[in-house]
């Protein structure tokens, strides 16, 4: 099992430098980058005593497997902040909020879901080990640093994990277009895990059966379904909104800032 990987893109690498500089083995920067972003990255690398190597575009393409690396890549060790979900949940001082993704295969969707999870104070994102994308370099880039702030768990048996979460006191709520209950009709202030299905077929049968409740997202247009990251954003915002109304503040979310 490999414990290191390459990530790319200025947002992803800058976030890793600020959050976990010790996890970076070295940074590779396009020798032709002389702009402000490159200079800022070089300065931050120097401040954190991180090795930075100037190299050619071809080398960056081979490292990352893409031409869309923005001229920068980093060789990093994988982060591991909690041994188990149970460890994470036991340390919480507020109602747990998890995002469970069943079989999401598109790295852009997973990256966007992680970014949304960070925005609304999700305590962890959970995925199955098989038939789902992992934390690839593309996921790091799309997530814009959220990989470094949101704990991520890949589990062997998702349905069993959901049952274990129930035993730990979480309410398991899934989304389904045919669900009779709508998102805006449900109280979401208790500890819960949102479960969203894959881009093509939605939740698998055993995952769906493990849910305590299924809800649909009210829509008035002609499109029958939404991108999984859009659905995640809507569900998590409604959860955050209800927590804010109940307590005067949301979950563990930083002060509001302009969206990018």
Curated annotation (Swiss-Prot):
User: Which SMART domains does the protein's record reference?
Assistant: SpoU_sub_bind
Q: What is its EC number?
A: 2.1.1.185
Q: Name one Pfam family in it.
A: SpoU_methylase
Q: Where in the cell is it found?
A: Cytoplasm
Question: Which catalytic reaction applies to this protein?
Answer: guanosine(2251) in 23S rRNA + S-adenosyl-L-methionine = 2'-O-methylguanosine(2251) in 23S rRNA + S-adenosyl-L-homocysteine + H(+)
Superkingdom of source: Bacteria
- Give the keywords, sorted: Cytoplasm, Methyltransferase, rRNA processing, S-adenosyl-L-methionine, Transferase
CDD domains on file? SpoU-like_RlmB
| Keyword Glycosyltransferase appears in the UniProt entry | no
- Record-level GO cellular component terms: cytosol
Q: Binding of S-adenosyl-L-methionine: at which residues?
A: 197, 217, 226
Q: What class of enzyme is it?
A: transferase
The main location is: cytoplasm
Tell me the GO molecular function terms: RNA binding; rRNA (guanosine-2'-O-)-methyltransferase activity
Q: Which cysteines are joined by disulfide bonds?
A: none
> What is stated as this protein's family in its record?
Belongs to the class IV-like SAM-binding methyltransferase superfamily. RNA methyltransferase TrmH family. RlmB subfamily.
User: Do you know which PANTHER family this protein is assigned to?
Assistant: 23S RRNA (GUANOSINE-2'-O-)-METHYLTRANSFERASE RLMB (PTHR46429:SF1)
Q: What does this protein do?
A: Specifically methylates the ribose of guanosine 2251 in 23S rRNA.
Protein name from the UniProt record: 23S rRNA (guanosine-2'-O-)-methyltransferase RlmB
Q: Which organism is it from?
A: Nitrosomonas europaea (strain ATCC 19718 / CIP 103999 / KCTC 2705 / NBRC 14298)
């Amino acid at each position: 099992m490999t414990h290191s990987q390459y990530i790319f893109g200025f947002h992803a690498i800058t976030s890793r430098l600020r959050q976990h500089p010790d996890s970076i083995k070295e940074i590779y920067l396009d020798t032709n980058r002389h702009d402000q972003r490159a200079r800022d990255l070089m300065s931050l690398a120097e401040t954190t005593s991180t090795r930075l190597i100037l190299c050619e575009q071809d080398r960056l393409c081979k490292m990352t497997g893409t031409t869309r690396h923005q001229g920068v890549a980093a060789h990093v060790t994988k982060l591991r902040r909690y041994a188990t979900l149970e460890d994470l949940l036991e340390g919480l001082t507020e109602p747990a909020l998890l995002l469970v993704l069943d079989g999401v295969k598109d790295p852009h969707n997973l990256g966007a879901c992680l970014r949304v999870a960070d925005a609304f104070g999700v305590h962890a994102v959970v995925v199955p080990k098989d038939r789902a994308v992992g934390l690839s370099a593309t996921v790091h880039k799309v997530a814009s640093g959220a990989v470094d702030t949101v704990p991520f768990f890949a589990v062997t048996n998702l349905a069993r994990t959901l049952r274990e979460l129930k035993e730990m006191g979480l309410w398991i709520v899934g989304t389904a277009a045919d669900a009779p209950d709508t998102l805006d009709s449900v109280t979401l202030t208790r500890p819960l895990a949102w479960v969203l299905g894959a881009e093509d077929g939605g939740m698998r049968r055993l995952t769906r059966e493990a849910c305590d409740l299924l809800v649909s997202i009210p829509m008035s247009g002609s499109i029958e379904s939404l991108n999984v990251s859009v659905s995640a954003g809507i569900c998590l915002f409604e959860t955050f909104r209800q927590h804010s109304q109940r307590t005067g503040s949301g979950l563990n979310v930083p002060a509001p800032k302009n969206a990018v």
